[in-house]
Amino acid sequence: MDEQKRPRAWVYARIPGDYDGTINSYKVCSMQALHDSCDIVGGSIDERGGWLLRPGYRDMMQQIKGGKVDRVYICRMRQISGKERHLYSFFKRLMQR
């Protein structure tokens, strides 16, 4: 039987000031990853804004840099940042992997 390796997914959610919305976003992304036949190898949630208060984001980036993640599921890109330069930096780091 020729079995293909399933993509390894990381789920990330962050909606500052809205814990319920963050949890719902995480659940929706998890369901989509499973629907896409991914193995969810990890996930993180941040409850605050600001780069220094986001351990979940830093953990996600370490896993990506370490080659342990093939896909990232995020409900809205604004959960990464509302600033274009931060989004550019995020994608640049992903592409260097």
Task: Give, region by region, the residue ranges found by the protein language model.
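Short, structured surface patches at the beginning of a domain
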Residues: 1-97
